[in-house]
Swiss-Prot record:
GO CC terms, sorted: plasma membrane
Localization per Swiss-Prot or TrEMBL: Cell membrane
Gene name linked to the record: lutP
Disruption phenotype: Cells lacking this gene are markedly impaired (but not totally blocked) in growth on L-lactate minimal medium but not impaired in growth on glucose minimal medium.
Organism the protein comes from: Bacillus subtilis (strain 168)
Protein name listed in UniProt: L-lactate permease
Entry-linked InterPro entries: Lactate_perm
Pfam family, one: Lactate_perm
Keyword Cell membrane listed: yes
Assigned keywords, A-Z: Cell membrane, Membrane, Transmembrane, Transmembrane helix, Transport
Membrane topology: Multi-pass membrane protein
Amino acid sequence: MQWTQAYTPIGGNLLLSALAALVPIIFFFWALAIKRMKGYTAGLATLGIALIIAVLVYRMPAEKALMSATQGAVYGLLPIGWIIVTSVFLYKITVKTGQFDIIRSSVLSITDDRRLQALLIAFSFGAFLEGAAGFGAPVAISAALLVGLGFNPLYAAGICLIANTAPVAFGAIGIPITAVEGPTGIPAMEISQMVGRQLPFLSVFIPLYLIIIMSGFRKALEIWPAILVSGVSFAVVQYLSSNFLGPELPDVLSALVSMAALAVFLKWWKPKTTFRFAGEQESAASIETARTNPAAPAYRGGQIFKAWSPFLLLTAMISVWGIPSVKSALTGHYEGSAVFLKWLNAVGEKLTFSPGVPFLNNQIVNADGTPIEAVYKLEVLGSAGTAILIAAVLSKFITAISWKDWGTVFKETVQELKLPILTIASVVGFAYVTNSSGMSTTLGMTLALTGSMFTFFSPVLGWLGVFITGSDTSANLLFGNLQKVTALSVGMDPVLSVAANSSGGVTGKMISPQSIAVACAAVGLAGKESDLFRFTIKHSLFLLLLVCIITFLQHHVFSWMIP
């Protein structure tokens, strides 16, 4: 039996309905920021509240609400949970085999300054992984690397989440941009160009902002040349590639150029003082001794290459998985004539499952009268997590770890991540209930009431969408058309508003419940999600304000920037 979404369930009053829809979100903020609940407790409680409001206020049939939660939970397991397990597993292999000691030494040979390490790994390397894979892999891997180098786990997770602001809109080979073309009818290239005229301002600023968070303004000024090289190289390539190539490659190209530029720059420039966190002076002294003492072990190029091989394999596998024709074959949707890809397509088809969600698939009708498809999307071979697992299998032979130890490390990883994965499953379940019940649309419609000030508040929709769904792609699909319709009604260029949805969304990623859960899982802070949320929330709001100002100015003052 079909059920039609109602966006004003409380007496036809939009504002009252919006207040009801806000309850789960306000509770989640309160649970983490004030009550400091454990992530899985807050996630499950928020899901429960969302289910109650969906059923009692929005009159959503109980079985449909419950099945919507299961749809989200399954997505939380695959691909998101699977990516986290395999990412942490690969990192643990390098630790178990002693290869991470060599990785640490190789990074220290470039710089043992914590500020510069954050720029190289959190900002540049994290952006590369975002462009190649997305879905939590960038924060999980880069944060684990920073912890291995000696960063405080909370700082590592927080810094990587904030650094991930710059690349999110073009993540996973540009999917957030290409996906929104369908519901809006606006060419992806135009949206790519507009986003590429907004985010470079953030990309220049984020490296400086990261270092200020880490060390304060005065310490940040000590390395301003390196910050400039990192941010400007990234921003320039991001602008050029998004405006002249399209949405697929800005992250990958920007990250590679930024990483290479900074590494080369550090060959001939060093900061006057080496920054380390408070409390690590003793270890810092031993690091300096090891770095300058000729008797300390000096690793050869071959040893360094071997140590980095697991992550080089990860990069290669994720990059291959992101190639459109390969990705199509991995999920059984390839229609070309290449022999190998046709064979891969046959395998991928057998390992891709899309069963309809019982009581839900095409059983919910939106305001336009269109039934909404609801399937359990299980792409076993096509998941980036599988690419990382293959890298872990190949790394077994390179690192010479026994199959027994390899299996033991995998079991330990799964055991450690049980509660974080429960957190992820519950918060994604909450996101799906919010969407399928119509609550998220109610909130979007309420923001659209801001009228002429919508030119300022437009990015807030994207921020809200990413907070709810954990994905810039999902936020664009959720609010993209609403952005277009509202923009036309208030005299705003829809290209700007849809781009602002994506640009605003990137600032919400660092406080998204699933992002918080992923980051905590990667650095061993399960149960400490509230601490990380309190760390990132103020930065999220500040960066959102910057995007709102940029969008407002581009409409009223710099309209020539709109393609």
